[in-house]
Design a protein with these regions (language model features):
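Glycine-rich, charge-decorated loop segments at or immediately adjacent to ligand/cofactor-binding or catalytic sites
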Residues: 106-111, 180-201
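Single conserved hydrophobic/aromatic residue that forms the stacking wall/gate
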Residues: 1-14
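Glycine/threonine-rich flexible loop motifs
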Residues: 153-165
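Glycine-rich oxoanion-binding loops at beta->alpha junctions
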Residues: 115-144
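Active-site loops and adjacent core secondary-structure elements that bind or stabilize anionic groups
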Residues: 10-11, 279-289, 296-301
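Conserved functional hotspot residues or short segments at active or partner-binding sites
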Residues: 292, 296-394, 419
Length: 419
């Protein structure tokens, strides 16, 4: 019996030893886990837009007379409130709003001239800076201390909101006004396409950028300012950027509000840089349908089996190309496209044109302005492949990528070769 008791005691001691060992291992594991937790949470923390850092914004604007460059995309996502309304509620002295292409509410057709008006809710004047007057005048800036830019870009050089930003920066530099950018993500965050060449400056190519510039509007403003691209003045503007929090290049971003009438969803935004070239041809990109920049077609069955008929659609396009004509082509609404720039669709339609190729570029000068060069059109006519065309872009793109690195406010892609 004594032996049995000793054996039981030894077994109990052994069990305690095992339990203590296991508890030590658990404790070590928990220490390691909790030491990593802050990093894990910071990586998964929610995105905070520049406009949502309201404590920073109000501190910058306190006791100043403010002008806003905003439209329907200037939303604080978490609060679902427009920046104008949020600033007024904070007691900020907003004197006037400057509206880009499509207007303050984003309802104007592409290219439509927007008239000056007043915001129905606040009574604040709204001044159009799209059309004849592309930047604020000295008189319009006279009663302002600072201009705030908060508009969602889509990352393409020919999307005109960044052209508006450039001209407003010029006006601020000319009149010694402070310019503040509230930063937002780039949903087409790639670097690709030909660089805009000298002689091809236009409202769809103000700055010497590739078609996909791979920058946020804040980073782009910094580049424009420091590279001396403000042509109307030797001065730089007094630039400040309210950065986003918890964002890095390459992070996916889905827009909560459509940036313009004919980019109604994320698929259209992804396809836009590649399909915009068709705007210089007679091929319809779906304007006048409920799926613009997601279909392609022309009134000839040789272009494809999918059919659609552009019509006058208020809120999209009231006078679309190929209006009331049955167009044959392709449906890209479900096309698995990750984004970037591709010429495959354009080259496919050009090759299908056959004997009609001589008339394919209905507006060759407009195509060259979109491309930023005449070389792309010449290369297509000569029959070069997409690979060969891309090779011609590489030297200047490499130079641009090196310059781009200097102006990054956020961690870059895993590799610089993302496209």
């Amino acid at each position: 019996h004594l032996c049995d008791r000793r054996q039981r005691q030894m077994c109990i001691r052994d069990r305690y030893t095992v339990i203590i060992y296991v508890m030590k291992q658990i404790f070590i594991f928990l220490v390691i886990l909790f030491s990593l937790t802050p990093t894990v949470y910071s990586q998964n923390a929610p995105l905070k837009l520049g406009a949502e850092r309201m404590d920073v914004v109000t501190r910058l604007l306190k006791d100043k007379r403010v002008g806003l460059v905003v439209n329907q995309t200037s939303i604080l996502e978490k609060r679902q409130i427009h920046l104008l309304d949020a600033l007024v509620a904070e007691g900020i002295d907003v004197k006037k709003v400057f509206a880009p292409e499509h207007g303050f509410r984003g309802t104007g057709d592409a290219g439509e001239e927007i008239k000056d008006s007043r915001d129905l809710k606040t009574g604040i004047p709204i001044i159009s800076i799209y059309g004849k007057n592309k930047k604020p005048s000295t008189e319009q800036l006279g009663d302002l201390d600072v201009i705030v830019f908060d508009i969602q870009d889509v990352g393409a050089r020919f999307y005109t909101y960044i052209s508006t930003m450039h001209y407003v920066m010029e006006a601020c530099a000319e009149n010694n006004k402070e310019f503040i950018v509230l930063d937002r993500p780039n949903p087409n965050d790639f670097v690709d396409g030909p660089i805009r060449q000298k002689g091809f400056e236009s409202f769809v190519g103000v700055d010497p950028l590739p078609i996909l510039h791979g920058l946020t509007v804040g980073e782009l403003a910094w580049m424009i300012n420091k590279e001396g691209w403000l042509k109307s003045t030797p001065d730089t503007c007094r630039l400040k950027i309210v950065k986003m929090e918890n964002w890095k290049h390459g992070d996916p971003y889905w827009l909560p509000v459509k940036p313009s009438p004919n980019l109604p969803n994320d698929q259209s935004i992804r396809l836009y840089p590649s399909l915009c070239f068709f705007e210089a041809t007679n091929v319809s990109v779906g304007r006048g349908t409920y799926y613009p920049f997601q279909v392609l077609g022309f009134p000839d069955p040789k272009y494809g089996n999918f059919t659609f008929t552009p019509t006058s659609l208020p809120g999209f396009d009231t006078n679309p190309l190929q209006k009331d004509k049955v167009c044959y082509g392709i449906d890209l609404r479900e096309y698995p496209f990750e984004g970037g720039l591709t010429l495959r669709f354009f080259l496919d339609f050009y090759n299908k044109a056959g004997k009609d190729q001589a008339f394919f570029f209905s507006r060759p000068n407009w195509f060259d302005l979109l491309a930023g060069t005449k070389q792309l059109r010449y290369q297509i006519v000569r029959g070069l492949s997409e690979k060969e065309i891309r090779e011609s872009w590489k030297p200047e793109l490499d130079q641009y990528k090196a310059m781009r690195k200097k102006y990054l406010l956020y961690p870059d892609y895993p590799t610089q070769n993302k496209k």
